[in-house]
Amino acid sequence: MCIRDSIDYFVAGVGSGGTFTGVAKHMTTLGAKNYIVEPQGSILNGGPIHAHATEGIGSEKWPTFLDRDLVDGIFTISDKDAFNNVKLIANKEGLLVGSSSGAALQGALELKKHIKKGVIVTIFPDGSDRYMSKQIFNYKESNDNE
């Protein structure tokens, strides 16, 4: 992995908080701002708890390994956006990623709307091969996930 000195923003989902905290500590030394991505239904951004289809990220409580002092902001992403990005990444980049990766991309795209310029780094933590039996490329919204 090549880390550049010109990274301005780090965006990633949080499960246990370990990956986010470890990477964010380093990104902070580069002067980067760190943003969490969570699915709707997770409580990190103060929203109500409910079921979500985006797997691997999101929480009903603050994760033990997440260092809150490293968090500069939180983006809450719909399942629809996460799964649409799974298809987009496969079609445009040929990468088979899972829904938490789709959410990470959406978080980076949301951040891009709020900044004038800068280098954004994100992590695609999962592959779609884990979710083929769940029809990851044929996601259908339910009324409670939007």
Residues covered by each model-derived region:
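Terminal helix/beta-alpha structural elements that buttress the NAD(P)+-binding lobe
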Residues: 7-9, 32, 95, 99-105, ...
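Conserved acidic residues
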Residues: 8-11, 72, 118
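A short, charged, Gly/Pro-tolerant segment at domain boundaries
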Residues: 121-133, 137-139
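Short beta-strand segments
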Residues: 12-15, 36-38, 121-125
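Short glycine/serine/threonine-rich phosphate/pyrophosphate-binding segments
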Residues: 13-24, 100-108, 131
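Conserved active-site loop/cleft motifs that coordinate metal ions or position small ligands
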Residues: 96-99, 119-124
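Conserved small/polar residues in nucleotide/adenosyl-binding loops
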Residues: 1-6
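Active-site/ligand-binding loops adjacent to catalytic centers
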Residues: 28-99, 114, 135-146
